Amino acid sequence: MKVRKMHYPLFSFTEYLSCYIILYFFVFLPNYSYAININNYHNKNNLWNINNKWNNQQSNHFSNNRIGHFLWGSKIRKNPLASISTSITTKKLENQKKKTNKNESYSNVNDKYEHNNNTAHFVQINYKNDQSNDTLSTYKNNNEMTVEGKPNNLASGEGKKEIHNTTQKILEKVDYFKEREKITNSYNNNNNNNKVIVTHDNKNHTNYINKVENKQSDDKIKNLNNKYIKKFKSHILQNDILGTISTMFWSGKKNNNGNVKKGIKNVPMDEKSYSPNDHDNNSNNSNNNNNNDNNNSNNNNNNNNGGKNNSYYNEKTQKGVNDKETNFLLKALDSGKFPTYCLVENIDENLDNFDIYMSKEKMDELNINDGATVLLKGKKKREMLGIARLDRSLKKHYVVISFAMKKNLRLMHNDIIKIHPFMNAKRIRNVVLSPFSDTIPNLSREELEKAVIHPYLKNSYKPLRVNSNIYIYYKNNKIEFKVLKIISEESENEEFGCIGEHSQLTLAEEYLKREDYEENNDDITYEDLGGMKKQLNKIRELIELPLKYPEIFMSIGISAPKGVLMHGIPGTGKTSIAKAIANESNAYCYIINGPEIMSKHIGESEQKLRKIFKKASEKTPCIIFIDEIDSIANKRSKSNNELEKRVVSQLLTLMDGLKKNNNVLVLAATNRPNSIDPALRRFGRFDREIEIPVPDEQGRYEILLTKTKKMKLDPDVNLRKIAKECHGYVGADLAQLCFEAAIQCIKEHIHFLDLDEEDFIEFMKISVDEDKKNMGNEPYGSSHTNNSNYINHLTESSNKLSYTNMFPLNRKNTLLQNDKNEMNKDSSYDKKTDALDNYKNDSTIDMEKKKNKKKSNFFFSNDDEETKNKNKTNVNQKKKKNPNDKLDKNERRIPAYILNKLTIKAKHFQHALNICNPSSLRERQVQIPTVTWNDIGGMNEVKEQLKETILYPLEYKHLYNKFNSNYNKGILLYGPPGCGKTLLAKAIANECKANFISVKGPELLTMWFGESEANVRDLFDKARAASPCIIFFDEIDSLAKERNSNTNNDASDRVINQILTEIDGINEKKTIFIIAATNRPDILDKALTRPGRLDKLIYISLPDLKSRYSIFKAILKNTPLNEDVDIHDMAKRTEGFSGADITNLCQSAVNEAIKETIHLLNIRKKEQEEQRKKNKNSFKIDDTDTYDPVPTLSKKHFDLAFKNARISIQPEDVLKYEKFKEKLSLQDF
C-alpha cells in the first residue's frame, strides 16, 4: 500500500488542474480587480497622504491607504497561491520600517519634472554627506520603467524576489517625493535667482538648471507632479498584480529572452536619459509650449545658453550622415591616431558665432570641459577660437559648427576640423573692429557702436582672433565685422585674446570694402557648386583622401587611385569642380589646357608633359588637371597625325610611372569620352570615370541659389518655380538665365541711355517712387519689400535686439525700412567714416573741371592720382550733402536710392526663359510650345486620354511606384489629315511644361552609311539630357514602314531598328514620351505598335457638330465679329469638314473682309482726290488712319467663303480609317 503525502492536500495533485483554473478566473481575478478599483478611488480622493508613515500601517491591508500593496510582498511572491491562506507577519512590517529609515539620510532634494509627448519624467538629485554623487531615475507612464540602482537587464536566474524588492523601492521613493514636497517648495520660495548651480566634483564643471520664474508655471508643474505620481503608482500596482498572476504557474522558469521578466519592460539607460549638465535645451522648448506666458523669455534664455532650436534637430535628422561616403574617415578616426580630428555633421546658422557642439566622449578624449575655449583649425591653415558645448545626442567623432566657423575655416559638411584645447587666451585691453560696407544698413557710427557691438561683445568673455569674421543680426540685417587688431596688457599685436570686463571695443575709422580686402575673391569653392552633391562626394573620396591620408590605403594594402576622368555635356561644371577641389584641398595644382601642349617642333610637346609631371612629383600633394583631354588623347587607331600618337604614348608612360601613394593624382575632363584612346581608360590610369549629369529639379534650385545669392531679387521671384520650368538646363544655362533676367531689368529702367547726364538723372528721379526717395542714400546691396504687413512686423520687432538668436536671413526681404527722419540728422553726414558718402569738396571738383575738358561716361570715375591724393587730404572738409542731390560731378555715380530701384522681378525671369534654351539642345529646335487646350476645339475624350498617358506620370509618379507599375512610353495618333494631331502633341507638351522635340520623318535619313542611326541615337541622347521631354515624330510612316516590304531600302530598316532599340532603352529615371502621328497607319511596322513601345493608338476622327462649334470658337476668339454671324449655324453647314478645312474657311472669310476694306479705302481716296482738285483752297483731306469701312467680320464674308470652300477628306477615305480602327479592336478582343 502506497502512502500519499498530505501536507498540502489541495495543491499537490495534478488531477485538480481544472479546479485551479476555476479558482484562478473566478476567485483571484475578481479580488485583484476590486483591489485596483478601490485603490484608484482612494487616489482620486487624495487619500494617499504623504504624512502616512510606514509604522502606522495595520494588518488589515484592504482598509488602509496602501490597498493591495502588502498582498503582493516579496516574501509571499515566492509562493503566490499559498499567500491567500497566510497573513502578513510582523517581520514584514519591521523590514518596511528599516527601509523607510534610509530616507533620513537624504540632505537635499531637487525635483525636476518634464512632460513631453505624454511622457512623464521624474528626476531626483540626491546629495549625501556633502558629496556630489548624483543619481538619475527616469520613469515612463506607458508601462516602461527603469530602476535606479539596478541593472536594466535582469539575469534569467534571478527570481521574483528581486522584482518585488525593486517595486517596493520605487513605491518608497515615490512616497518620499511627496513627503519632501514641502521642503522643495520652501526651498524654491527662498531662492529668488533664476538658476541653481550644482557643482560636481567628479566631473569638474558647472551645470545650470533653469528654474521657472513664474508662480503660475510653478503651480502647473506641481499639478503635473501630483497627476503623474498617481498614474505612475497605479501602473506599478497593475504591473505587479498582472506579473504575479502570469508567473503563478511558471515559478522558477526562465523567460524566452533570458533578460526580461514578465510584466516589466526594461528601458536602457542610454536610450532615454536626462542629465542636469546637459546643455541641450529641447526640454525648455517643450516647457515653453506648455507655458505660453513665458515663451519669449524662455526662448531668449535658450539662445543665450547656446541651446539649439528644434529646427536644428529636424534638419539634422533629415540630412543624416552617409556611412558609405565617410567610411574611410571613420576608420581612421576610430583608430585613435587622430584624437583632435572631427567631422562636421551639420552647419547650424542659428548658433552663436563661437559655439561648437561636440559629444561627451570627444570632450573626455580632449580633456576639456563644457564652456572651455578651444582652437579650431580648418582648411588652408585657417584658425579660429571657439567655445566647446556639450551635446549628448552627437556621436563621438561628429561636431556641429556655426555659420561664422564655416566662413572663417572654409568648411562644409563631412569636412575635417581639428580641435585643440587652448589655455593661453590673454585678456584683451582693446580690440579694433571694422564692418564691411556692403553689410551695414543706414546706421550712424554711434548707433553701430552702442546698439550693435557693445551689447554683443561687452563683458561676454568671447574669444577672438585677428582677421576672423563675426556676424551680428540687428534689425533683420546681418552685419559682418572683421577683427583687425587685438591689444593686451603685454603686447600691442596679439593674435588671440579673450574679452574681459575692462576690454575696450573700438570701431575702425574707415569701413572695409569687400572687393579691396578679400583675397582671391574669384576662387571657386564647394559652396559655389550646386546640384552635384553625389558626384562631388565621389570625386572628393577619390582625390582628397589619397592626398590627405595616403596611410589609409597603405594600411588596407591597396594602392591609391591615380586618375579620375569626368565626362558630361558642356556646361555641367566639370572645370569648376576641378578648380574647387584644387582650391579646397590645400594641394598644388597644375592645369593643362589640351591645345597648349601641342607644338610644331618635334619632341617639344612630350617634353612639356614630362616637365609638368616632374614638378608635380617634387611638390606633393599635387593635382594635375587636364582640361579637354580629348584634344590631346584621341584614339591612335583613327588618328593620322604622328604628333597626337606620340603625345598619347607619352601620357600613358607618365601615368604608368607614377609611384604608388606618392600623392600625385591626375584629374581630367572631357565632353567626348568615347573619342579618348581606350588605353587611357583602363584601371591603373584613369581608375574611375564619373559622369556629371544634367541637374534635376532640386539640383537646378541649388544652382539658382548660388547664382542669385548676390543679386537683388524682388519678393515675387520664386526660384522653386523657375527651377521646375528649366528642364534640361545645366549650370551654364542657369547662369545665362540669371544674366538675361538682370539685363532685362536694366533695359526697363535705362533704355534712355542716349539722354544727357542731367536729363538722365532727372528722368530716373521721376521714375522712383516717392516713399523710396525718402529712404535716403542706402547701401547698394540692399533691397526693399512691398509687403506692408511684413515691414510693420519687422518694425515692431526691431526694438528688441537678440544677437545669439541668429536666424537665417531672408535674402529677398533683407532691408528694414529705417526711420525716415534719421537721414536729416546732421550727425550722420558729419562723420568722416561714413562709408556711404564719398563726396569730394568743391575745390577738388573745380580742379578736376579744369583738367578734364572732355565729357566722360557718367558710369565711371575720371579721378587721376593727384585728385585722389587731394581727396584724402581734404576728407575732413566734407560738406553736408542731401542724398537727393543730382549726380555727383566728380565721382560720376548714380545715387544709391536710384540704384535700389533696380530689382530683378519674376517677369524678368519669365522673359529670360522665353529667350534661353538648354545648350545641349540648341542643335535642334527644342522649346515648350505655346499652344494650349483652349486653342484646340472639341476632342475632349482625346484630351483626357493624353492627360492620363503623359501628365499623370509626371505629376503622380508616386502612385505608379505604389502599384509597382510602369507608365506608357508612347502614343500613336492616326487619322485623316488636318484633324489636329500635331496641335494635340504641342498642347500636351505645354500642359506638362516638358521640352518638345519635333522630328520631321525624312530629316533623320542621310546618304552616308551609319549616319542615320547615329542621328537617332543623338536624338534620344539629347531627349534624355532634357528630360522630361516629348519626342514628336510627325509623318512617322516615312521612317517606320513595314520591314518585310519589297522596297530594298536598307537604310530605313536600320533606322527603325535603332528607333525600336532606343524606345526599349528608355528607363524610369529619364522621363521620355514618344508621340507619333501618321495618316497611313496600315503601312507601319507591327513591332513599333506593340505594347511597350507605342502603347496607345488614338484615332483622331473628323469633328462632330459640337467639336466643330468649339473649333470655330477657338479660331475666332480674337476676331471682331458682327452680330449677324451665327457660329452654330456655320457648324451645321460644315458637315464632313476637318479642323484644317474649318481654319481655311475662316481664313477665307477674313481675306474677303480685307479685300472689301481695301476696295472701300481706294474708293474714298479717289473721292478725296477729286474733291481736292475742285476746291484747292477750302478742301482739307481727312485722316484716313481713323477711317475703318469694315470694322467687323460679317455673315456675308462667310457666305463668300463657303462658295469657295472644299472638303479635303472624301468619305471613302474615312471608311478606311474606320475599318482600321475596327481591325485593331478585334485584335485587342
Curated annotation (Swiss-Prot):
Residues 252-267, 282-314 have a biased composition (Low complexity). Residues 268-281, 819-837, 882-892 have a biased composition (Basic and acidic residues). The keyword Protease does not apply. Keywords: ATP-binding, Cell cycle, Nucleotide-binding, Repeat. GO terms for cellular component: apicoplast; cytosol; nucleus; VCP-NPL4-UFD1 AAA ATPase complex. PANTHER family: AAA-FAMILY ATPASE, NUCLEAR VALOSIN-CONTAINING PROTEIN-LIKE. Belongs to the AAA ATPase family. GO terms for biological process: autophagosome maturation; mitotic spindle disassembly; proteasome-mediated ubiquitin-dependent protein catabolic process; regulation of cell cycle process; retrograde protein transport, ER to cytosol. SUPFAM superfamilies: ADC-like, Cdc48 domain 2-like, P-loop containing nucleoside triphosphate hydrolases. Residues 252-315, 814-837, 860-892 are annotated as: Disordered. This is Putative cell division cycle ATPase. SMART domains: AAA (SM00382), CDC48_N (SM01073). One of its GO terms (molecular function) is ubiquitin binding. ATP binds at residues 568-575, 975-982. Gene3D superfamilies: 1.10.8.60, 2.40.40.20, 3.10.330.10, P-loop containing nucleotide triphosphate hydrolases.
